[in-house]
A protein has these predicted regions:
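Surface-exposed extracellular loop regions of Gram-negative outer-membrane beta-barrel proteins
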Residues: 506-508, 515-521, 529-576, 596-620, ...
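C-terminal beta-signal and adjacent terminal beta-strands/loops
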Residues: 646, 697-704, 712, 723-769
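A beta-strand signature from Gram-negative outer-membrane beta-barrel systems
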Residues: 231-279
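Membrane-embedded beta-barrel scaffold of Gram-negative outer-membrane proteins
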Residues: 404-420, 541-546, 570-626, 631-635
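Gram-negative outer-membrane beta-barrel transporters
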Residues: 451, 456, 493-496, 592-600, ...
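Flexible loop and strand-edge segments within Gram-negative outer membrane beta-barrel domains
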Residues: 317-321, 330-343, 349, 354-401, ...
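Short, acidic, small-residue-rich periplasmic hinge/interaction motif at the N-terminus
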Residues: 129-166, 174, 204
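Extracytoplasmic beta-strand/coil segments of soluble accessory domains associated
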Residues: 174, 178-218
Length: 769
């Protein structure tokens, strides 16, 4: 699949391949050059023309999503004078006809005769080789491997682009993350339900969410609600575990796990004569869900780009669910779950010879009613939450042969207004207002001493302040200074990366006790070895160790009655051993990864939700997590312009409490962490209609550390189906898609007493111009 997200089966350019001419007197030879693949069957490529005798040599394009390092398609025309399977030195090469000097020695008639003879010989070879199909020349198909970052990286990297969203039947951001190995999504159900991500049992607070490379901070809660990001407004989602794959990056991005959300404006600048392009989309789904969106990009030159995007989302979320309790079982509908969201973005990019500047501004507004837990068949609730966020960020990058550097700045403002209209049963104050402001600065530089050794330094500074109408958090702030020193060494098949991080935190709370200040040093090391480097098979072995450190959030420290300034910071130790393999034989390609890990968490902070807005926090002492992550991605081209795409993953997590050996909870699985989980999807792509079947599943879980029958969450599996098609209309493209979610109408819960939606449909239309 192309990294750009285009459908290689349905969206193909029809540019001609013939662009260069070689003149030999009256005989003109066409040289094939790299271009876009043509629709339908491979087109005839006229390569030689001499008078009235025209020799047609057909060149077929072998589409291989693993061939081109830049994400496109490597096009290798067939040359009968080359050995089969031997690639030429460049994508376009002239046929080995007699030298031009030799042709000059012949008269015009002789040259024409030579051309006719060559044409007859090639025509005879053509007819003998193609007895079954007289319209197709036998071709030599060369299959090579494209180097994926995920296969050669020292750390586990999983990435999905917009094409993968279609091929896997993904409908929202939470669904996309649920398809990644090692990820546990805590989902409160419905389009308006909060969705947070825990990776390898470490908790959501250890997962850093970045947008176009810069972190999305929420120091108040310590975790980011991924439901606010519209899947249609993302070009890719990337998960990096253990460490960051690149040597030079903001220090914030060196968290235990990083979810990087990539906007379409982060894609490479276009090199064409179309200065104006954009998209208009509409998504409609069950339970009165509407989601129109639009984006527009103006590119007056190949170095300048300005863009804007906006989307609006509305859903009643009054989906039906089933409560089972013997003869008292009932069919109910979710209440108080309506949600309305509006979001706008502005982007500007300027590129120079060695540098680039990218600036962005965003505003987000969300008003939703918070559905309560279903207790004794009562699911009504009177809570509401209004959230607003505005941020502006700018990032500058510079690079030459020996040096590279970056600098970035970001200002983030957030407002949350929580209301509970039933004051008789409200937990805490019935009206709570929070204002969060953050100033974030980061810079770094890398020196490449040779092709083998590089050294990088980066530093971050952040000032975060929180104010509210509650006495406990009326005015609190934190200053954070992070530094990292990194070194990498490459020699042949071996790659080694070393890092050292310094964390400094200063907490402030005028007139009251503040949380303790902290200074910590944490190391990280990762390595990879290319065990096999053949043409059709590459195998890498990798290993890594890292210590990660995080402070308690403001809610964990200061929230009235539930927060505590005595909470201790978390320190995690991660160990990873992995294997990656990539192979391609003919029409079949495969990418396989397997990673075994062992994590130790000291003084783990566990947030147990009372509802969508109020949390309880405690230190568990020590937690040990052992697990295995397996991923498989394979494609099979079954016919011209048709392929099967299979993607699957499996995760094994044994996350146990090891705090007190005499406690009743010693050795129990952590809350909401399934021991077995996985996902799979199978797509059949054709030029007429593409079909997808997908499933996600998880084993038994518990809502608390006490493993009681009342706290058990049964295992579940959810199936879905999708169909989509694209129409290319000149420079425009129309994409239509239909999804059937939870096709078998299963009733299940991910968070206890928050039922998930049952069978539902989703329709979408996207116009690209």
């Amino acid at each position: 699949m192309r990294e750009t997200g285009e459908n290689p089966v349905q969206s193909r350019c029809c540019k001609p391949f013939l662009t260069a001419w070689y003149h030999f007197g009256h005989c003109e030879l066409h040289q094939p050059r790299e271009g876009g693949p043509c629709k339908g069957k491979p087109e005839n490529l006229p390569l030689a023309r001499a008078g009235n005798a025209i020799v047609a040599l057909h060149a077929r394009i072998r589409f291989n999503p693993l061939t081109n390092p830049r994400g496109g398609v490597q096009r290798i025309p067939f040359n009968p004078l080359y050995e089969a399977g031997t690639p030429p030195s460049c994508p376009g090469f002239p046929l080995l006809f007699p030298k031009k000097t030799f042709m000059k020695l012949l008269s015009f008639k002789a040259r024409r005769a030579v051309a006719v003879v060559i044409g007859l010989v090639l025509g005879a070879m053509y007819a003998a080789a193609q007895k079954l199909d007289p319209d197709t020349l036998r071709t030599a198909e060369v299959t090579t491997l494209r180097k994926h970052e995920s296969i050669s990286a020292n750390v586990p990297v999983q990435r999905m682009d917009s094409m993968a969203f279609k091929q896997r039947g993904i409908t929202d951001t939470g669904d996309a993350l649920r398809r990644l190995a090692g990820v546990t999504v805590r989902d409160y159900g419905g389009a308006g339900g909060m969705k947070t991500v825990s990776v390898r049992g470490l908790g959501a607070a250890h997962t850093m969410v970045t947008y176009d490379g810069l972190g999305m901070s929420d120091v108040r809660n310590g975790q980011t609600d991924l439901q606010r990001f519209n899947i249609d407004a993302l070009a890719a989602i990337e998960l990096q575990t253990l460490d960051y794959a690149r040597l030079l990056c903001p220090v914030r991005n060196l968290a235990a796990a990083v979810v990087n959300l990539v906007s379409p404006f982060e894609q490479p600048l276009r090199s064409g004569k179309q200065p104006l392009h954009g998209t208009v989309s509409l998504r409609q789904a069950a339970f009165n869900t509407w989601n129109p969106a639009a984006s527009l990009t103006v590119q007056p030159s190949e170095r300048t780009q300005v863009g804007a995007a906006a989307n609006w989302f509305y859903a009643d979320n009054n989906y039906p669910f089933y409560v089972e309790n013997g003869v008292a079982s009932e069919h109910l509908r979710r209440a108080n779950s309506r949600m309305q969201t509006a979001q706008t973005e502005l982007h500007a990019r300027q590129r120079w010879t060695h540098s680039q500047l990218h600036a962005a501004a965003s505003f987000y507004h969300n008003h939703r009613r918070l559905p309560g837990p279903v207790v004794l068949y009562v699911n009504d609730n009177n809570e509401q939450l209004t959230e607003q966020q505005a941020f502006g960020q700018a990032r500058w990058t510079w690079q030459n042969k020996a040096w590279s550097a970056f600098a970035a700045a970001k200002y983030d403002w957030q407002k949350s207004h929580y209301t509970h209209h039933n004051t008789a049963i409200a937990v805490g104050a019935p009206r709570q207002k929070y204002y969060q402001r953050e100033v974030y600065l980061t810079a770094g530089m890398q020196r490449n001493f040779s092709h083998h050794i590089a050294l990088a330094y980066a530093t971050d500074y952040a000032h975060t302040a929180l104010s509210s109408n509650l006495p406990a958090t009326k005015r609190v702030s934190r200053d954070t200074w992070l530094q990292s020193l990194s070194a990498s060494w490459h020699a042949g098949p071996v790659s080694l990366t070393l890092r050292g991080l310094c964390h400094l935190y200063a907490n402030h709370r005028p007139g009251a006790e503040a949380a303790d200040n902290e200074v910590r040093l944490t190391p990280a090391v990762s390595a990879s070895v290319r065990a096999v480097g053949q043409r059709h098979l590459r195998v890498f072995l990798r290993a890594g160790y890292k210590e990660a450190f995080r402070m308690p959030s403001f809610t964990e420290n200061y929230y009235h009655h539930l927060g505590s300034t005595d909470l201790k910071p978390e320190l995690t130790r991660q160990t990873n051993l992995g294997l990656t393999a990539q192979t391609a034989y003919g029409p079949w390609q495969m990418l396989l990864t397997a990673d075994a890990y062992y994590n130790q968490v000291e003084q783990r902070i566990v947030s147990i939700p009372y509802n969508l807005f109020v949390w309880r926090t405690v230190n568990l002492g020590e937690v040990r997590v052992g697990g295995l992550d397996l991923t498989l991605h394979t494609t099979l081209r079954v016919a011209p312009r048709q392929q099967l795409v299979l993607t699957t993953n499996y995760s094994l997590q044994r996350a146990a409490d090891r705090s007190v050996s005499t406690a009743a909870t010693y050795g129990n699985q952590l809350p909401y962490t399934p021991r077995h989980s996985g996902a799979a999807s199978l797509a059949w792509e054709t030029p007429w209609l593409s079909l997808v079947a997908h499933t996600t599943w998880a084993s038994e879980r518990w809502s608390t550390l006490e493993h009681l029958p009342a706290t058990s969450l049964p295992r579940y599996s959810e199936w879905g189906f999708a169909a989509y098609r694209s129409w290319q209309l000149g420079r425009h493209r129309l994409d239509l898609r239909a999804d059937l979610v939870n096709a078998f109408n299963r009733s299940y819960e991910i968070v206890r007493r928050y039922p998930m939606p049952r069978r539902a449909y989703k329709l979408s239309a996207v116009w690209t111009f």
